[in-house]
């Protein structure tokens, strides 16, 4: 049955109520029925370059995984001396440690209450225990086939990327799980290296690139966005160059992946905003904005 429209008379006006009898048909739709309808009043409008900037967090983690795998391949092939990697990683960690304090003027350290002596002790304890257990790490998975080790490493690195904290407030985010999966992947790959020294340095490098490096990048992003963009570009080109030295096809696919995430996906997101339709009105559920904590104590 088609809806019938009846012109309101000055004497009787239609009201949006159910508890009064009105002289209108049941299927009557007044012209003022949707006058309180609002669309997209709380919708967030994204800007293209802002989305590109935020996508750099994903780029950073993809490059970290790529660099880690490239370094492992070089060590496995005997093209990279473990002593050189350890020295370079140690020097880079010292530079990053100094920058971490200089970026915010030491405010983060004051808030956390952690001293440099405590950091030094933690570092020495970690290096000592990792070096002591490196023979165990080297022989931990000897009974497991190499194909299984590689499959486990790939699975763990994918899990690291999935559960990593990219800044989104989601239930799937778990920084602890993400880091543990990355370390487990490093242990799996380190067990296939020639010597225990290689395994020790590989696990140490994994801590540096998967635990310490994201902390520095997060602070760079918050305090010096331009420097953060420059470091991200340099890191991406380094990862691309390292992968190119191993496989040209893999490097091209990796570059296409980075381009899609940083350029095409933000453009697609901006384009989808045209189709966003969130409606609001008096039918919305009531929201209690008053602080009710005093009633719960």
From Swiss-Prot:
GO terms for cellular component: glycosylphosphatidylinositol-N-acetylglucosaminyltransferase (GPI-GnT) complex. Keywords: Endoplasmic reticulum, GPI-anchor biosynthesis, Membrane, Transmembrane, Transmembrane helix. Pfam families: GPI2. It is a multi-pass membrane protein. It is found in: Endoplasmic reticulum membrane. Signal peptide: none annotated. The chain crosses the membrane at residues 67-87, 88-108, 153-173, 239-259. GO terms for biological process: GPI anchor biosynthetic process. Pathway: Glycolipid biosynthesis; glycosylphosphatidylinositol-anchor biosynthesis. Part of the glycosylphosphatidylinositol-N-acetylglucosaminyltransferase (GPI-GnT) complex that catalyzes the transfer of N-acetylglucosamine from UDP-N-acetylglucosamine to phosphatidylinositol and participates in the first step of GPI biosynthesis. Component of the glycosylphosphatidylinositol-N-acetylglucosaminyltransferase (GPI-GnT) complex composed at least by PIGA, PIGC, PIGH, PIGP, PIGQ, PIGY and DPM2. Interacts with PIGQ. Interacts with the heterodimer PIGA:PIGH. Belongs to the PIGC family. This is Phosphatidylinositol N-acetylglucosaminyltransferase subunit C. It comes from Mus musculus.
